[in-house]
Structure formats: C-alpha cells, structure tokens
Amino acid sequence: MSKGKKLIAYVGCNHVANFEGGGISVFEVSEDGSSLTLISSVKDKPKRAGYLTYAPKAKVLYSVDERKTDGRGPIKPASCVLSFKVDPESGQLTFLNSQRTVGAMPASVAVHEDKKLLFTANHAFFDHVVKAVETADGRWVEKFEYDDSTVVQYGLAEDGSIGDVQDVFVFTGHGIDPWAESPQGGGHAPASPHAHIVVVDPSGKYLVVCEKAAERVYVFRIGSRLELASVYQCPLGTGPRHAAFDKKGCMFMTCEFASELWSFDFDASSGALRFIDKQSTLSGFKGRNEPATLQIHPNGRFVYMNNRGEDTIVWFSISPDGHLKKAGKVSVSKSPDPKDATRAMTLSPSGAFLLVPDRPADVLRSYAVGPNDGSLKVLKEVPIQNPVFIQFVEL
C-alpha cells in the first residue's frame, strides 16, 4: 500500500430475526492486518448484505440484498442491488440508489466501469409452487414451477448510481433431481438453475457466470446486450459455484457438489474454456461439504478456498502451467450446517493478509500470509454480527 493511503474493509452482514446485524460495516485496517477498527456502519439497508464490489473511478460501492421479493406490492424490502458513494477521506458510505434484481436471491455483483455496466447473478430460491394443469386429453396433473435464475445487466450513470435494466438472461435446464447426495432444497437443489457468480475476465470483453444446477459455466460477450460466447458443460455432480481469474488469464473455480477446485485456460479471443486440472479440497473429511469462494494471491503462486462442512480454509500452489497442489489448511469455527458456515474471505490488495468473516463465531479475523509458502497465521479478531462478505478499498 502506498504511503499515506488508507485501507478500508467493507463487511456485508446478514440480518437474523430477533438479533442485531445486517447492513454494511466499515473498518479501517492496518497495512499488515494486525489492527481492525470499526469506524461506521450502514444498518438500515441492505439488511441482508452479501456480495460487494467497488468502482474505483466513481468511488462507488455496490451490494446485493440477498432476499426474495415477497410478492406483488411487496411488504418487506424487495430483492435488489444497491449503490453507495464512498467518502474519499473517511471511507464512510452514503446511499445513492437501488434497483430491483429481476430475479430472486441475488448472489453476486460485478462492475465494468469503462463500459458503465453492472451485472448481478440471481441464484433463485429452492422452493417450488405446485400448479394444477389439465392436459390435452382431459387429465389433471401437477406441474412444478421454480424461480427463474437470471443474470441482469444494468447501465450506470456518471455518478455511479445504478440505471435501468438493459438485458436479462434466463437460465434453463436442471441437473440430477431428486439427488439424495445433496440435502440442499430437500434433495431438489438441481431441479432448477442457480447462478452463483458473475465475474469480468481480465480482458474486459467477457462476463463469466457459474450455474450449478445444470452444471454449466456460461461466457457472455459484454456489450449493449448479453451475447452468449461459449458454454462449458461440467459432469453431473460437479456444482460450479465461484470463479476468479489470475493476472495471466487462467480461471479457477470451486465446485460445490464435488468438493473440488478446478483450473482452466481462458481463450480471450473466443471466450472458450480449456480444462487444466482439478484437486479435491478435502483431507479425509467424510461429512457433507460445500466449497464456497476462492481468492488468488497477487503473486499468482497460491489460490485460497474455503470448505463449508469441513470448515477449513485451504490453499493450493499454482504451477506456471496452471496445475494445482494442496499446500496447507487452517480450521475456522464449526458450523451447524454448511449453509450457515463461513462462506467468504478476501486477500488484502498487497496479499500480506487474509481477512475472514467467520460467521458461526460472529467475528472478523485476519491471518498473516506467509510470503514464501502461503501459510496462514492468526493476527487479530474483532466481534461483528453475522458477517458474510468483505470488499477492500484503498483511499
């Protein structure tokens, strides 16, 4: 971090009924991660803050509000994506505006500042409705309908506030249903699509979306509308969830159903993915496990991911050609269920430390990162209610 700069960590928190929490908390963080100081918070919106991203030119923070709109003329807040102006001196947040997400349970958000575009992946809920349908031959049958899972493209105004919806892609297909090996959705999680991540590739030409039910990775060309460039079909039982790129353009992906980490070569001329390697994220654990997020170290030598179930953070070394080798792990607080586990973590811009929102323990914890072996050593813990996601900003 440059001399005189201030490092801010924005922590998205989920509100839990009958407890405090929710909103976005603002921490000032020392360069080495040994000091975490709460300086302000936005509690009223979003109540179910999750994924965050930052537009440095506009100095605007974006957040999803992880919920399903409760019906026409909603009584509770609607499913939405929100924008906040970041004070360049203090890092405090001022609400700008919000837009509906055109889909339930927004899981992630990505910004393309040069093209003034914002994207959300809307996961959709697991619940279904049962419709009574009369067939052409006069029989009455049950029809099962699910939420649409979508990726939505918005325009951005000059001040970074969120404009109108420009395009929506509705995912189709399903995986194994019912699937006894996955208790998600009562064994029906793959019954309908669930998009989990949107990420812009390093070239700025493509948007990558992982959809875990039909086991697909979608690549869209970025423009005035979402143009499908390629689709990578994973084997059944994979569950592509989270993806990230290194500086060379290799893509890494966690697999929620298979408990694996994959690596790909990404062709920036066509948007095609070429599989390189995969490794198990587990070390003998036999219970239910669902990998979540991943982070790539700025030096490009290590990738970190977290297991929900085994409740660990695992890091892998990355060879020059993209192959993976498990290098170590640390435990985080035990969760009663993978859906309630620690689900995210974020490396500092310099890579000196990793910041983890340990959800079951209600703490924010920093780990020093070993520069040579990627190892993690606890530095500091501070209390915070139900933390979910972290976004660093240098001011």
What are these regions (language model features)?
Residues 37-115, 332:
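Blade-loop segments of beta-propeller domains
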Residues 1-31:
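An edge-strand/N-cap motif at the start of beta-rich repeat modules
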Residues 36-43, 93-100, 162-181, 228-232, ...:
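Beta-propeller fold detector
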Residues 26-34, 84-91, 153-164, 220-226, ...:
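Short loop/turn segments immediately following beta-strands, especially the blade-tip
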Residues 46-56, 102-113, 132-133, 140-145, ...:
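Beta-rich, blade/repeat-based domains predominating
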Residues 11-18, 64-77, 120-146:
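Short, conserved, GDST-rich strand-edge loop motifs in beta-rich repeat architectures
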Residues 14-16, 66-68, 123-125, 156, ...:
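Short loop/turn segments immediately following the C-termini of beta-strands
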